[in-house]
From Swiss-Prot:
Pfam families: Proteasome. The keyword Phosphoprotein applies. The modification N-acetylmethionine is found at residue 1. The modification N6-acetyllysine is found at residue 203. It comes from Mus musculus. The gene is Psmb1. CDD domains: proteasome_beta_type_1. Residues 1-27 form a propeptide. Its main location: cytoplasm. The modification Phosphotyrosine is found at residue 149. GO terms for cellular component: cytosol; nucleoplasm; proteasome core complex; proteasome core complex, beta-subunit complex. This is Proteasome subunit beta type-1. The lineage of its organism: Eukaryota, Metazoa, Chordata, Craniata, Vertebrata. Glycans are attached at residues 57, 208. Belongs to the peptidase T1B family.
Amino acid sequence: MLSTAAYRDVERELGMGPHGSAGPVQLRFSPYAFNGGTVLAIAGEDFSIVASDTRLSEGFSIHTRDSPKCYKLTDKTVIGCSGFHGDCLTLTKIIEARLKMYKHSNNKAMTTGAIAAMLSTILYSRRFFPYYVYNIIGGLDEEGKGAVYSFDPVGSYQRDSFKAGGSASAMLQPLLDNQVGFKNMQNVEHVPLTLDRAMRLVKDVFISAAERDVYTGDALRICIVTKEGIREETVPLRKD
């Protein structure tokens, strides 16, 4: 049986007065929403892969099953964004506008490293009201080697060989650490990562993530960046 103090706590949480009458209730507005989704990027010797699922959800509702989170920026650069879908769209539009301005001014496309530095300044400029987005950039650098850049919401970034972000990142990152980075492993030969093995690995980890993460699923969109350009591949995932 609840004590008098416990009843008062319940009344206070429900906004009820001392005699059960409804009291004033404060409604809170949040400018953010989490729309789920997972992005991943892997860099090889002469290629880079950026992949994401296509599910767009909120809570227990699926808004659409065909919303890929990989956006082509140039012929050598792709960005993966997950988090709040509204911020993802806004941020990618700003980046695309900056890239067009740069190309018109310099008669050439911005490099992958320069795009990463530009994105860092954009995110830092919004540090007091940040974009709720997990950003990963994948592409080729000036020497034609694969490059991956990962960001936090306020602009701090670093170059990696592989990175996962989004709702299933806690499941994907340990697999990448083990299979790509060979971390915490003894007597293992560090063989270079081939494109075929990287593709198989990306498909396997996303199939596993879709089994465990309710916000990841429906389909897998893979963008493969090579010196020939960018090609896309779609793989079905579970839809429940």
